[in-house]
Amino acid sequence: MDDSDIMVLDQNDSAVSPVDGVPCSFENDPGKRFSFGASALISPRKNKGRKAFKTVPDEFFGVYCLISRSQLKHYKNRCYIGYTVDPNRRIQQHNAGREKGGAKKTDNRGPWDMVCIIHGFPNSIAALRFEWAWQNPEKSRVIRDLSLKKARKETPFAYRLRIACHLMNCRPWNQFALTFRWLLPMEELPFPENILPPKHTLLKYGLIEKSTTEISCEYSDYIEKGECRLCDEEIVKLSHLVRCTSCAAHFHAGCLAINGLAGQRNLLYPVLGDCPRCSQSYIWGDVIRDQRMILRVSEAQTNTALKEMVPRTHSS
């Protein structure tokens, strides 16, 4: 499996749970409470009855928190923060030991549970910087002035969760379209009331689903770049194009950014905005993620006539 062949999972449609987004398997099977006892942290997406096309893996950059389930008092309930593009493979490596790719700090100190993961970072650099700050809050210039210390009755995980909430509210991460996912919903703790995640941060539960984007060679699956719906000028380069995540209207990236900023001068691009065509709200990080997907499809496209065209969405 390719490192980046992973994307976001929503709940299993066939399994209805009283808790939104929590697969029934978690509730009905106590053995799946711990990730080292579950078959996978990644649920494969199956497309039945679809014509086979070449695909590109969708990008995934995540920073996770492990909890030790060791029977040894010295290691039990310790936390480990890490970065991954493949949560399933990473937890297997941690529990298999250092020789199998696990970390030095998790070797012989488990088994380990991957309890939560924060994903939606635009690239690996942004995720790795978040990982380092989460590991080293006393050194990170972003939050070191807060002098965050573990309270006497606070569990190691509750302390790490509090640090993560502070980081998600700091630049640049508070401008990203992040998702906080409880991989093991039974381990969920309430977020600190005084430092909740940003309002645009998604909260999800359950597994992460592998996802790929098809590269169709059918002309009918593409549309022309056309004109920007704001300035009415032609969009010359595919790299200049972004589209609304609701109505799929095309814009110059710069035009939509200026429109979304609505006069704000302290930012280069908006965090949230309203589409000038359909008036639906969008998260800028989702718009850019879609743009990156369009460019990756173009790069992998073998039909030169389609390279500068835009893959259709359900809205287009």
Predicted regions and their residues:
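Non-catalytic localization and substrate-recognition regions of ubiquitin/SUMO ligases
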Residues: 243-245, 263, 287
